Swiss-Prot record:
The keyword Aminoacyl-tRNA synthetase belongs to this UniProt entry's keyword annotation: no
GO cellular component: plasma membrane
Name of the protein this chain belongs to: UPF0756 membrane protein lp_1894
UniProt topology in membrane: Multi-pass membrane protein
Family that this chain belongs to: Belongs to the UPF0756 family.
Main location: membrane
Amino acid sequence: MESWLFLLAILVVAWLGKNQSLQIATVVVLLIKLIPNTSKLLTTIGQKGINWGVTVITVAILIPIATGQIGFRDLWHAFKSPVGWIAVACGVLVSVLSFHGVGLLSATPEITVALVFGTIMGVVLLKGIAAGPIIAAGITYCIIQVLHLSLQ
């Protein structure tokens, strides 16, 4: 019963915060919970859902390469600027931080509750996005702003 109340509270917060992604995600989880004998499905989604989400985001990121909007020339150009090098460094940093984050969650699963709450607060109150690879771009943006670098 507690999980239903918690999910409904999240749905209300998502609705009040006008966060469509969180609303959809919460409704999907509630609908899955309504179906009998779905505990294995919920467990599988809980264990593999992040990887599936990262895969979907990665596909979306690769689309400009597939359509020809981005090519080797753009990659070469990126390496000729401080902004490009910062982006590469942030990508490496995020992957290392993610590695350590997974280790932390494995060692202390109770932190998951705080992370979920913090993510929901960031998504709803600060109009953030609950995503992984996009964090690298966000960190890159912050460093670029601090160093007053041009995006060109």
